[in-house]
Regions:
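Glycine-rich, charge-decorated loop segments at or immediately adjacent to ligand/cofactor-binding or catalytic sites
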Residues: 102-106, 178-201
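Glycine-rich oxoanion-binding loops at beta->alpha junctions
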Residues: 110-142, 154
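Bacterial Sec-dependent N-terminal signal peptides
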Residues: 1-32
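N-terminal phosphate-binding or glycine-rich loops at protein starts, especially the Walker A/P-loop
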Residues: 41-88
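A short helix->loop->beta-strand "cap" motif at the edges of active sites that frequently abuts
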Residues: 87-88, 172-176
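Short internal beta-strands
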Residues: 89-99, 180
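Acidic, His- and aromatic-enriched active-site or binding-groove loops in soluble protein domains
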Residues: 197-214
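Glycine/threonine-rich flexible loop motifs
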Residues: 151-163
Length: 214
């Protein structure tokens, strides 16, 4: 590449970057987080939210999509932590395939036809039971939804499908979502495997992704 073409490319790239910075995002917002880079540890989204004393969700009715993997680096579960905050009201817990606590999911109490979490008193909804979407009546009670779950890094997991359905429902009800991210356990650097055909799209292949999606 000649020097002239290289300079033109750099200028174009710079203008594209400036335009992207000015436009930012239409539906998303950037939240300032504490600088923890001086610690030689991994901090998940839940750890960061705890560092901010959960200010983003205080004085709000929240729904949480999680399972047993939603723990801090000190192995404290999100439901145990938030259950101690009087100014955070957990209205609903959305559980994925296998439930909140895996196959041994007997901790929720059955009161009438409703399942209740004994720690927070929140109503529990399994997104794989009957309807793949949460009920409209509970969505109308929520101010924000928090998602914290460790995915597997492969397409066959239904977690990403349930999250997508939750996003679709939240969009219909104009409810903001906070995603507490976690690292890909099989790393996000490698992509492997074929793409599914559209005619075979299912809940185990809701998105047209390779088996190992990165």
């Amino acid at each position: 590449m000649s020097n002239l073409l290289r300079n033109i490319f750099i200028v174009l790239a710079t203008f594209c970057f400036i335009e992207a910075e000015e436009n930012r995002y239409t539906y998303s917002s950037i939240v300032e987080i504490p600088d923890l880079s001086f610690f030689n540890h991994l901090y998940t989204g839940l750890d960061i939210l705890e560092q901010k004393d959960f200010d983003l969700i205080k004085d709000k009715n929240i729904g949480i999509f999680c399972n047993h993997t939603a723990v801090t680096r000190n192995n404290k579960h999100i439901l145990d932590i938030l259950g101690g905050y009087e100014d955070i009201n957990i209205e609903a817990i959305f559980e994925p395939e296998y439930g909140i606590w895996g196959m041994d999911d007997s901790r929720a109490k059955l009161i009438g036809s409703k399942r209740i979490d004994p720690v927070t008193g929140a109503k529990v909804f399994n997104l794989l039971d009957r309807s793949l979407y949460p009920p409209n009546w509970i969505m109308k009670r929520l101010d924000v939804i928090v998602i914290d779950i460790q995915d597997t890094g492969v397409r066959f997991s239904t977690f990403i499908s349930s999250i997508t359905k939750l996003f679709e429902s939240a969009s219909d009800h104009k409810i903001p979502i906070i995603v507490l991210d976690r690292p890909n356990p099989i790393n996000g650097l490698r992509i492997e495997g074929p793409l599914p055909r559209e005619e075979y799209q299912s809940y185990e292949a809701y998105h047209l992704l390779p088996i190992r999606h990165g």
